[in-house]
Amino acid sequence: MTLYRNLLLLASLGLSYAAPSKVQRAPDSSLHARAVCTPTAGGDSSTDDVPAITEALSSCGNGGTIVFPEGSTYYLNSVLDLGNCSNCDIQVEGLLKFASDTDYWSGRTAMISVSDVDGLKLRSLTGSGVIDGNGQDAWDLFASDSSYSRPTLLYITGGSNLEISGLRQKNPPNVFNSVKGGATNVVFSNLKMDANSKSDNPPKNTDGFDIGESTYVTITEVTVVNDDDCVALKPSSNYVTVDTISCTGSHGISVGSLGKSSDDSVKNIYVTGATMINSTKAAGIKTYPSGGDHGTSTVSNVTFTDFTVDNSDYAFQIQSCYGEDDDYCEENPGNAKLTDIVVSSFSGTTSDKYDPVVANIDCGSDGTCGISISGFDVKAPSGKSEVLCANTPSDLGVTCTSGASG
């Protein structure tokens, strides 16, 4: 009888496993449309619209959308802090115009501050959005007082998964975009950037991109007109890709400067599809020499490929005596460690400034010069193509002429 009861129990359990009850899942009622906010513009430059934008960020900054409509103008007379954004989408289809108040901006780091933000999209979907740094007064003041400290237009420090796209950025008092503080996964795409002075004073120090301590930064489909580095790869930049960029009037795409007062490194850089117009150089590396308070510079796994040179002074340049004169560097030679530097597929014509020289490769005698060059088809206006070299490897890939400096 006991055995019969046990068999009956097992049978009932087996039946239970064979025909489990179905669980019906109701639709998730917690999914909501993104909150959308449109800040109220004050209407003229006497009203600072930053408080209204900050209020919109408080309401919609956590996963919502903030819209600046096409045809609208917002006057920003103070720093715009986007710290309240978390996975928010800021769509600039109108004009954000900063005040030119040189007293207010003196010594400030940023006009737009993005500090430890995750998931920001700052973009224009229509391509009509403009961020105007209104930097003319700052350039004019700096021309007479080089100690005047000017802010960066967009300053990113820390954070991750940031997208800046589709916008026009114009006339920053200083640098256009800066990335540092360990930021990661930052994408700049489809940007038009220009700094044009209406006076005889040039838009000094208007780097397009200063990329410092960060990883996985991408710059793609960008046009820059400025008066300093188009892209500056600063200390501790790592895994940076620049793909399809046009730079006019710049100091080129530069690694550095490095080693001014500490040991600095830049590594894992890939630059391709660059058109360099009226630049002091198309691409290059700038390192301080040894001695004094200078540190050691390490540059590794850097590729410059598919460059078109149009009236730029040098196609490629390495400076191992940056920031010092020749006498200093005779006593304190360059000690930068350059490894796996690839320069390939350069074409075009330089300016006549250094004709017949098209490149100046001055590696430090106390460092390493791991550089290879291939597909280098750049000529001076005379039709000649002379490359000045110092302390370069025998298998560099181009015919060298002695006399490199810098």
From Swiss-Prot:
Q: Where in the cell is it found?
A: Secreted
Active site residues per record: 228, 251
UniProt-annotated glycosylation sites, renumbered to this chain: 84, 278, 301
Primary enzyme class: hydrolase
Where is it mostly found? Answer: secreted
Classification via InterPro entries: Glyco_hydro_28 (IPR000743), PbH1 (IPR006626), Pectin_lyas_fold (IPR012334), Pectin_lyase_fold/virulence (IPR011050)
- Name the Enzyme Commission number(s) assigned to this protein: 3.2.1.-
The record's similarity note reads: Belongs to the glycosyl hydrolase 28 family.
What protein name is recorded for this chain?
Probable endo-xylogalacturonan hydrolase A
The organism named in the record is Aspergillus niger (strain ATCC MYA-4892 / CBS 513.88 / FGSC A1513)
